[in-house]
Amino acid sequence: MSRRVATITLNPAYDLVGYTPEIERGEVNLVKTTGLHAAGKGINVAKVLKDLGIDVTVGGFLGKENQDGFQHLFSELGIANRFQVVEGRTRINVKLTEKDGEVTDLNFSGFNVTAQDWERFSTDSLSWLGQFDMVCVSGSLPAGVDPDAFTEWMSALRTHCPCIIFDSSREALVAGLKAAPWLVKPNRRELEIWAGRKLPTLQDVIEAAHSLREQGIAHVVISLGAEGALWVNASGEWIAKPPACEVVSTVGAGDSMVGGLIYGLLMRESSEHTLRLATAVAAMAVSQSNVGVTDRTQLAAMMARVDLQPFN
């Protein structure tokens, strides 16, 4: 049976990724360039899914002035492209990794989405997204997109495709959660902001996740960084800890986890197997300079080393 996924990235970026032992503020810092990638959270998810053999369609907005890198990537990977091109330039995000694994993001501004652009996207996307088994909506809102309009679009999307996977932050996260998507993947800090309080223990995190579920969200996955991830759904609560590995870059690790979650859910795997797979895919991303699953044997070995336990 053919399984199809669409990913929506409203605010993609070219990721300029580099390494420096330590950032010294106010000084000239020498940086080793490790890559320049056409990226964005949903695009990273699409790359992982394509590597795992899933048919993927991507959509969102692209800036007219520097779209070539994205168009080339979609063609090269064989990913169906439904992006809407708007006036302006897609932004550049600089991501610097230090020797201790700390990542500093410098996210520049990009194109502005007009009211007409948004109306066209909203109408067009809702006309074709209903054909997919799952839709992944990821990332931030570009300039010009009203959070309330985004909530309305997400709510309308639910009537066309109930299985929405949502991964965002800040105002986009708050707006999207109002539409009660099927699965959400905040990190611990984002969950604290939503809850309006610190969550110092894992039990606190679990309780906040259940509060989200009470709003109609079926699956809540909380990224804990190097500590792994928690998954809370109607069947139970699990915590997965990734195997130790050399950290090359943490850029795209969260998106890789989302790709693994979607794949496991599409294949109707158990929650335990799916979380183990997603944690392994994220660990693979950390050990390389770009996202993707290039070696299924390596993935299987990584899965075997994931420590997964019921939380209670």
Task: Give the location of each predicted region.
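Conserved phosphate-binding/catalytic region of the ribokinase-like
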Residues: 174, 202-312
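Conserved phosphate/ATP/ADP-binding segment of small-molecule kinases
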Residues: 147-237
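Gly/Ala-rich phosphate-binding loop of Rossmann-like dinucleotide-binding domains
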Residues: 50, 158, 266
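Glycine-rich phosphate/adenosyl-contacting loop at the front of the ribokinase-like
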Residues: 1-59, 67-69, 312
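Conserved N-terminal subdomain of the carbohydrate kinase-like
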Residues: 27, 51-133, 301-312
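Short beta-strands and strand-loop turn motifs
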Residues: 105-107, 132-140, 167, 185-190
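Hydrophobic anchor at the start of a short beta-strand
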Residues: 5, 54-56, 81, 164, ...
